[in-house]
Amino acid sequence: MTNLHRLMKEQNIIVNEHFYAYAKQYKELLEKWNKVHNLTGAKTPAQIDDFIVDAIAPITFLPPVKTAMDIGTGAGFPGMILAFGMPDTHFTLVEPLAKRASFLQFVKADLGLKNVEVKAIRVEQLDPQPYDLITSRAVTDTNMLLKLSEPFRQSGSLLLFYKGEKVYDEVSELSNYKIIEMVNRHYLLIES
């Protein structure tokens, strides 16, 4: 059993049959690209596994959605990883940094992902359109994420923000939200 399999089993995260194959290829590509381009702080295979588990964990509580947008995808956390585990959802990964967007495009092509689209621009430059799910990890505070995501929300859209313990300081003015606590993470789920 690989480290990733063990971590997923410990958190009772069940994924589709292709997830582990995609994750393995992704890890190999990330390790290779990261040496040259410094795409993420996760440097070792174990750290990358932790990032993958952190990114995919919300599939344990997310309802099925048709469309999703990830703001500030970086090296693929969480958007690319969620796309591996949610093959029926079309993901738009928004990443303005050219080196990271190039990596995401390469992963999409190398893995033959049909449910991923990469936008190499800032989210503020995207044409407004509604998404069922909007995600973000390590980009900015909740209020700014609410402003950035506003043109892309519709009634019933879900917002999923990957937060730390300070999330409780950011929700005082919110209603219609849940905080799901898992290992080393607080997932803020807001219904608009």
Please place each PLM-identified region on the residue numbering.
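N-terminal cationic-hydrophobic initiation segments that often serve targeting/anchoring roles
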Residues: 59-60, 83, 150
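Conserved SAM-binding loop of SAM-dependent methyltransferases across substrates and taxa
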Residues: 75-88
